[in-house]
Amino acid sequence: MPARWLLLLLALLLPPPGPGSFGRTSTVTLPETLLFVSTLDGSLHAVSKRTGSIKWTLKEDPVLQVPTHVEEPAFLPDPNDGSLYTLGGKNNEGLTKLPFTIPELVQASPCRSSDGILYMGKKQDIWYVIDLLTGEKQQTLSSAFADSLCPSTSLLYLGRTEYTITMYDTKTRELRWNATYFDYAASLPEDDVDYKMSHFVSNGDGLVVTVDSESGDVLWIQNYASPVVAFYVWQGEVLRKVVHINVAVETLRYLTFMSGEVGRITKWKYPFPKETEAKSKLTPTLYVGKYSTSLYASPSMVHEGVAVVPRGSTLPLLEGPQTDGVTIGDKGECVITPSTDLKFDPGLKGKSKLNYLRNYWLLIGHHETPLSASTKMLERFPNNLPKHRENVIPADSEKRSFEEVINIVGQTSDNTPTTVSQDVEEKLARAPAKPEAPVDSMLKDMATIILSTFLLVGWVAFIITYPLSVHQQRQLQHQQFQKELEKIQLLQQQQLPFHPHGDLTQDPEFLDSSGPFSESSGTSSPSPSPRASNHSLHPSSSASRAGTSPSLEQDDEDEETRMVIVGKISFCPKDVLGHGAEGTIVYKGMFDNRDVAVKRILPECFSFADREVQLLRESDEHPNVIRYFCTEKDRQFQYIAIELCAATLQEYVEQKDFAHLGLEPITLLHQTTSGLAHLHSLNIVHRDLKPHNILLSMPNAHGRIKAMISDFGLCKKLAVGRHSFSRRSGVPGTEGWIAPEMLSEDCKDNPTYTVDIFSAGCVFYYVISEGNHPFGKSLQRQANILLGACNLDCFHSDKHEDVIARELIEKMIAMDPQQRPSAKHVLKHPFFWSLEKQLQFFQDVSDRIEKEALDGPIVRQLERGGRAVVKMDWRENITVPLQTDLRKFRTYKGGSVRDLLRAMRNKKHHYRELPVEVQETLGSIPDDFVRYFTSRFPHLLSHTYQAMELCRHERLFQTYYWHEPTEPQPPVIPYAL
């Protein structure tokens, strides 16, 4: 139980609040002990310390207010204490922590930087007089005014301070950046052995877990809908801060062993799963989150398995980090604490800073704790203000960038601190003794203007005349090239060596741009020497300086052993991986010292290859879509380098001795569907999904493999706003895997994305049945598809897993395309749920319908056909110890699905209080417990899931159902009181 001990250790290390924190005031008697929770949206919740339930809420302005219209975000503020982080300096060194906060900047203002930026700060205090019983604001006290106050004995005085920092550019006369930070007046935390609670807060949302500091038990869990920034208790006459720990939401769920909807009191009623020692250690990070339309930063603790951006990294590439391994549950569902091994781009590598700033939202996530910057506070006042030597920073010789608005400087070579006055003396000594005369300055400006005018006129003339001469030269070269090309074709027929004309070989730009000789795209860069051919055979003698083509074969060499090199792609012709349609051959090759698969495509298919490459570029950032590297061309072929894979899905299923390497069938299907959902989100229809086009990757560093969708040759990119495509260009796909609407003459509507869902349904059955097809043998498949004659005999109606799989596959291969679910619907289906999630779903359903009327729409839907689900009387189908225990407390109806779910929920909640024989018959929670019921009532999960679709829009059930963004909201079914 390392996770539980770790949480207890963290709770003990928290500095607890001072004495008198439980309900003591000098003039007001608290009706109950309160805890005050401040959230990022400006709310102050008065909550019960015992349960965390909200008694009342005071709503004010958000804790942070930063501009949203600036092109580049200058700083990331911390809502916990007003700390500031920069997004990088001159060298894009990533996030950097500044050694001062917004309140400290306000304290130091007014000040001015050397590049003309004025800093202005404002601090405004305000007092709120609050009715302690209702939370109503009775009076507001500020320096401007004070309302009248009615006398009361239960009043609470809360002070709040507003810090505003503004930066103004004197050159552009525009506001550069500003921020407002609010904080409640409170004393600092103190040691208090009587305070027995520790608070853990998740980053990015309002989840709070309060733990008993001594036992480590979870006292209560609440979600306050906005990130929590501070906790306070009432001591004497003022608030006093209580220390809390910010934790990643994945880590918090891991530590408390929770999943699904939170918001109820939960304690550890069963031990944690066995985890490695390393995974139980928490690491400090910096979490960058988003509130409204702006970013903020906050310290956060994470456990091993949470992806962390390395220190000094800037934004990752758009294709995302490289994933060497992902921990996924046995049933295809990501576990609560996924373990990933991510490799981020170490830097921008020459990418423009503009693109970096436009994509700064990609910073959201956990980063390694940044280094602190060595900075100096600028305190140079404008000329019309009184100057003091210690407050003046002279103009710097270098123009400071926007990221250095607060004058971020490196440490001196001897690592000794330099004071502001010393810096002033050094720079005054280097300053010129006499300013430049105004007349000399005007003469220099006039000379500059005249020279610039002449240069501009000459440049315009060059731009006008140069394209004409270049166009004439290109026409002559093109005519000459056509003549030489005719010679090539004639000499190739006679198998004679060809010597191109000297003028052509002397023009590298012509060779690089003409096309038939060389073309690189994707991640491949042009050849360093444009004169060198991009296609060569090795071993072979080097090309002669006269321009002999090295791609022609030498009579004394074995063709099968030559290494073909085209640009950055190389391969050996004997390493054939497979053959495709239209003469396509796939070789094992190399690209940038990486093993790849090389597709060699004939000229007749160049247009299809270009379309495939374009679609690969758009979609390959997903881990379950084949990765594309580059494209090269020579005179005869086009070559596409893609990710090298170990096998196809067909080999995975049909070869009995195939090493699965931990990739279970349901996990494989989940990954395939995830890749398909990604394609559909990009308006791409695959149109040829089959086992042969689903590839399995090479094992990663952890020995794991994953499924990837490949072969984009028949893909269709739909225009924006379109959801269907025409059949006029033919019927794409492979016989036996084509949806019926593609071939049916009776179908008047154009096909849609659902053709892929049909093919995926066939693939699902193929994997689960270990090689069978829902529409029979290969010769009759397509005919059976048109007739709708499917056969799912491998599924048994008395087996829970088969019932769930059959229900999903029947929807996916439905004859009516509109009845098929989307890929995102499929991913939400119980087919992929873990046993833990199944149990949580049953519990949430029981909670939802507990007080619903028997004649209400939800209960009626749940009980419709329910007697068959519970086998007429579920009480007669459970073991005797459980029957005996159920009779002790309440009466259950044996023919009611609702009562069966209620019994499951009650026994799960009171599992530790059950007799030993009942615990033994139910088994451990959650796996054995949920199997106990689903094995006896195999249709229970499927029936309940379909019945509760009425509530799919409710927040409680959004984890279990998917609804399209454009789907109309159904009428709200209110909770029964």
From Swiss-Prot:
<keyword id="KW-0732">Signal</keyword>
<dbReference type="InterPro" id="IPR010513">
    <property type="entry name" value="KEN_dom"/>
</dbReference>
<feature type="transmembrane region" description="Helical">
    <location>
        <begin position="446"/>
        <end position="466"/>
    </location>
</feature>
<feature type="binding site">
    <location>
        <position position="599"/>
    </location>
    <ligand>
        <name>ATP</name>
    </ligand>
</feature>
<feature type="site" description="Interacts with hydroxy-aryl-aldehyde inhibitors">
    <location>
        <position position="892"/>
    </location>
</feature>
<dbReference type="InterPro" id="IPR000719">
    <property type="entry name" value="Prot_kinase_dom"/>
</dbReference>
<keyword id="KW-0723">Serine/threonine-protein kinase</keyword>
<dbReference type="GO" id="GO:0030968">
    <property type="term" value="P:endoplasmic reticulum unfolded protein response"/>
</dbReference>
<dbReference type="GO" id="GO:0001935">
    <property type="term" value="P:endothelial cell proliferation"/>
</dbReference>
<keyword id="KW-0805">Transcription regulation</keyword>
<feature type="modified residue" description="Phosphoserine">
    <location>
        <position position="729"/>
    </location>
</feature>
<dbReference type="GO" id="GO:0046777">
    <property type="term" value="P:protein autophosphorylation"/>
</dbReference>
<dbReference type="InterPro" id="IPR011009">
    <property type="entry name" value="Kinase-like_dom_sf"/>
</dbReference>
<dbReference type="GO" id="GO:0042803">
    <property type="term" value="F:protein homodimerization activity"/>
</dbReference>
<dbReference type="GO" id="GO:1990597">
    <property type="term" value="C:AIP1-IRE1 complex"/>
</dbReference>
<keyword id="KW-0834">Unfolded protein response</keyword>
<dbReference type="GO" id="GO:0006468">
    <property type="term" value="P:protein phosphorylation"/>
</dbReference>
<keyword id="KW-1133">Transmembrane helix</keyword>
<dbReference type="InterPro" id="IPR008271">
    <property type="entry name" value="Ser/Thr_kinase_AS"/>
</dbReference>
<dbReference type="InterPro" id="IPR018391">
    <property type="entry name" value="PQQ_b-propeller_rpt"/>
</dbReference>
<dbReference type="GO" id="GO:1901142">
    <property type="term" value="P:insulin metabolic process"/>
</dbReference>
<dbReference type="Pfam" id="PF06479">
    <property type="entry name" value="Ribonuc_2-5A"/>
</dbReference>
<feature type="topological domain" description="Cytoplasmic">
    <location>
        <begin position="467"/>
        <end position="977"/>
    </location>
</feature>
<keyword id="KW-0325">Glycoprotein</keyword>
<keyword id="KW-0418">Kinase</keyword>
<feature type="binding site">
    <location>
        <begin position="643"/>
        <end position="645"/>
    </location>
    <ligand>
        <name>ATP</name>
    </ligand>
</feature>
<dbReference type="GO" id="GO:0071333">
    <property type="term" value="P:cellular response to glucose stimulus"/>
</dbReference>
<keyword id="KW-0460">Magnesium</keyword>
<dbReference type="GO" id="GO:0043507">
    <property type="term" value="P:positive regulation of JUN kinase activity"/>
</dbReference>
<feature type="glycosylation site" description="N-linked (GlcNAc...) asparagine">
    <location>
        <position position="178"/>
    </location>
</feature>
<feature type="region of interest" description="Disordered">
    <location>
        <begin position="498"/>
        <end position="559"/>
    </location>
</feature>
<dbReference type="GO" id="GO:0070059">
    <property type="term" value="P:intrinsic apoptotic signaling pathway in response to endoplasmic reticulum stress"/>
</dbReference>
<dbReference type="Pfam" id="PF00069">
    <property type="entry name" value="Pkinase"/>
</dbReference>
<keyword id="KW-0472">Membrane</keyword>
<dbReference type="GO" id="GO:0106310">
    <property type="term" value="F:protein serine kinase activity"/>
</dbReference>
<dbReference type="GO" id="GO:0043531">
    <property type="term" value="F:ADP binding"/>
</dbReference>
<feature type="region of interest" description="Interacts with hydroxy-aryl-aldehyde inhibitors">
    <location>
        <begin position="906"/>
        <end position="907"/>
    </location>
</feature>
<feature type="active site" description="Proton acceptor; for protein kinase activity">
    <location>
        <position position="688"/>
    </location>
</feature>
<keyword id="KW-0053">Apoptosis</keyword>
<dbReference type="GO" id="GO:0017148">
    <property type="term" value="P:negative regulation of translation"/>
</dbReference>
<keyword id="KW-0812">Transmembrane</keyword>
<comment type="subunit">
    <text>Monomer. Homodimer; disulfide-linked; homodimerization takes place in response to endoplasmic reticulum stress and promotes activation of the kinase and endoribonuclease activities. Dimer formation is driven by hydrophobic interactions within the N-terminal luminal domains and stabilized by disulfide bridges. Interacts (via the luminal region) with DNAJB9/ERdj4; interaction takes place in unstressed cells and promotes recruitment of HSPA5/BiP.</text>
</comment>
